[in-house]
From Swiss-Prot:
Annotated GO biological process: enterobacterial common antigen biosynthetic process
Source lineage: Bacteria, Pseudomonadati, Pseudomonadota, Gammaproteobacteria, Enterobacterales
Highest taxon of the lineage: Bacteria
Protein name per the record: Probable ECA polymerase
Principal cellular location given in the protein's record: membrane
Family recorded in the similarity comment: Belongs to the WzyE family.
Gene: wzyE
TM stretches of this protein: 6-26, 37-57, 63-83, 118-138, 155-175, 181-201, 207-227, 228-248, 341-361, 378-398, 410-430
Species: Escherichia coli O17:K52:H18 (strain UMN026 / ExPEC)
Location of this chain's protein in the cell: Cell inner membrane
Amino acid sequence: MSLLQFSGLFVVWLLCTLFIATLTWFEFRRVRFNFNVFFSLLFLLTFFFGFPLTSVLVFRFDVGVAPPEILLQALLSAGCFYAVYYVTYKTRLRKRVADVPRRPLFTMNRVETNLTWVILMGVALVSVGIFFMHNGFLLFRLNSYSQIFSSEVSGVALKRFFYFFIPAMLVVYFLRQDSKAWLFFLVSTVAFGLLTYMIVGGTRANIIIAFAIFLFIGIIRGWISLWMLAAAGVLGIVGMFWLALKRYGMNVSGDEAFYTFLYLTRDTFSPWENLALLLQNYDNIDFQGLAPIVRDFYVFIPSWLWPGRPSMVLNTANYFTWEVLNNHSGLAISPTLIGSLVVMGGALFIPLGAIVVGLIIKWFDWLYELGNREPNRYKAAILHSFCFGAIFNMIVLAREGLDSFVSRVVFFIVVFGACLMIAKLLYWLFESAGLIHKRTKSSLRTQVEG
């Protein structure tokens, strides 16, 4: 890449970054937080944060990258995607009418809400316990990270339930919403994330998500400022780099350490070059249509329920890894959101996907606002826990693609909804047995005086 070519790419990158950052800033000034702000920051991180890192790798370490015209296509496709997404998100689908009382879909009380977070936490802890009994601490047993996807590890499906510890702790926080509950959320979820990091053998997702939710709650409540958020972001990048070194068993120093930091940080936070690789091999892609969305559900079907279930699932990540990169190491490589759309239907699917994503984020913001307006604090805690708990799925959307997002968000809704229904059923059983006694003002006053 020549300096002239880099200059052209830099101008396009700068314009796209300023365009998205400006719209995000205006939205932040207006509402302080919603899921459009979160997705916009996530989109910036995924598709634009990596460009400076790639540039340093090219000019400082002479690392090979895709041709400049392909990198240009990747930047422009990301910028155009966001423009279509933003217009879709801002388009009002129906006329705004005055709020009229409606019969709520469901209600929550104190006991049901506490039962819900206890069940969610129980799902996570029991899953971790069973996985640990089968495998022990994989971080200290396995020689390479890719081995966690091999047949040596049993009970892999249980890992999908670990994440429900975070929604459980979110319910606890939203019931109190003070600084002590906020700090308790951070300590409990990060401690759990470190535990799963050691047990699973290097998976950092629970730590990243817990820390991100903690920061956004702090921004919403005004407990942290933007410069503190930036400082925490830098600390998070360094922390993730250190965990990556431990995961891969690397011991580096000097120029090698700087080089390793650049490419690991790029691959962890901003795999935008994967989109460029897909575009470079565009003519060789056999478009998969909507089949990857259906196939991605296969991993959630137990083999005892479907004995003939395919052992290798050809979703967009695996198609990119196996067919485009010819990589059969056992580790799927993220195609990114736009890359998954390219695999499914080529360039035509990029604007269509942007419209779909705009509607998805609009729905989450509608649910979030519903929680903000809800007078029942127990129901509001459940709604907010569901919305913030789905942040993991939005990260999957940006990094892994639309097919992975759909299967995971459906799984999240089913498990979260099942825990909610079990809590309501248990409350009904306890109430029928006479074990539930409603609090009265006189009893509360007696407790306070005592």
